[in-house]
Regions:
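ATP/adenylate-binding site constellation spanning eukaryotic-like Ser/Thr protein kinases
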Residues: 9, 49, 67
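Non-catalytic, surface beta->alpha helical segment in thiol-disulfide oxidoreductase systems
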Residues: 58-76
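Thiol-based oxidoreductase modules, predominantly thioredoxin-like and allied folds used
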Residues: 27-40
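Short alpha-helical
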Residues: 13-14, 38-39, 69
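Local sequence-structure signature of Cys/Sec-based thiol-disulfide redox active-site neighborhoods
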Residues: 1-25
Length: 76
């Protein structure tokens, strides 16, 4: 599994911002749609997520749209 994974809801504005941010910075990542596959939300919650989007970068979680936290975790 890619060490960078976004658990997202397809209609979520913050989810779209995170995906756009990753794409704009050339970050390779996997996307897990929790709306289409609700079992993925349970998987993310078991790993510590409380809110979505939940971005897992290695073993760290960034929840919601937090550009500064994403930059710090990605070394940008």
């Amino acid at each position: 599994m890619n060490p960078k994974v976004i658990f997202y809801d397809g209609g979520c504005a913050d989810c779209q911002k995170v995906s756009a941010f990753f794409s704009a910075h050339g970050v390779d990542y996997d996307r897990k749609n929790i709306k289409a596959h609700p079992e993925l939300a349970e998987d993310a919650k078991k790993k510590g997520a409380k809110n979505f989007p939940a971005v897992f970068i290695n073993n760290d979680i960034v929840e919601g749209w937090n550009e500064n936290a994403l930059r710090a975790k990605l070394g940008l």
